[in-house]
Regions:
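Bacterial N-terminal signal peptides
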Residues: 5-14
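Boundary at the C-terminal end of the N-terminal hydrophobic targeting segment
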Residues: 17-19
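Extracellular/periplasmic catalytic domains that process cell-envelope and extracellular macromolecules
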Residues: 22-25, 105-111, 164
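Active-site acidic/histidine clusters and adjacent loop/turn architecture
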Residues: 23-86
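Stable alpha-helical elements in mature extracytoplasmic
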Residues: 51-58, 112, 155-159
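Mid-length scaffold segments of soluble, non-membrane domains
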Residues: 84-119
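Catalytic cores and adjacent binding grooves of peptidoglycan-active enzymes
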Residues: 99-101, 114-185
Length: 185
């Protein structure tokens, strides 16, 4: 696969080099969000240009509703390490990587997917030996969706409703695995 290397200048006084698959148009957008302390923050998402308008509209509605999102930073600030970003409960879109346990590229590799508050909304997969693989590993306390806890995305949640209204699919409704943090379109 061919790559173009682009430099994305962020509004937060930093520059990030991003390996971008040839033919994929990425955009850098700034979104306001309310953090877990109730403070307004400026977040940065690198996403596919075809998703930028939807994401701006969704984040605007989440912000107006004071929906808590701990942090929104490019994955490059975590050394392009998805697990590290998820452990920090970082909401992000673009990450050039395959689907976990596969050679097939993730929707994140094209900026077509977003993970919201991933620590509290882990990806849960039952392995062939019957054990659960939970990502991030530190999200284990939040894998049991029957337990009550803050920041949990459910089908009754505002975040869920907004993404669905914009035509996204939720990983929490998948059959083979449950990726509660994940929305893609």
């Amino acid at each position: 696969m061919k790559f173009n290397v682009i430099v994305v200048c962020l509004l937060l006084n930093c520059a990030v080099a991003v390996a971008q698959p040839a033919g994929v148009a990425l955009d850098t957008i700034t979104v306001r969000h309310v953090d877990f302390q109730g403070q307004t923050q400026q977040g940065v998402l690198i996403c596919n240009k075809t998703r930028a308008k939807d994401l701006r509209e969704i984040f605007d509605e989440l912000y107006k509703a004071k929906y808590p999102i701990e942090r929104v930073r490019p994955i490059s600030e975590y050394g392009d390490d998805d697990e590290r970003s998820m452990r920090a409960n970082n909401t992000s879109c673009y990450c050039y990587r395959p689907i976990a346990g596969s050679k097939k590229l993730s929707k994140h590799a094209q900026g077509l997917a977003i993970d919201i508050n991933p620590l509290y909304n882990p990806c849960v997969r039952r392995q062939k030996d019957g054990t659960l693989l939970i990502q991030p590993a530190t999200g284990k306390p939040y894998a049991d969706r029957k337990k009550p806890f803050k920041y949990k995305i459910t089908s009754r949640d505002l975040c869920y409703r907004l993404f669905i209204e914009h035509g996204f699919r939720w990983g929490g409704s998948w059959r083979t695995l449950k990726d509660y943090q994940h929305f893609e379109k």
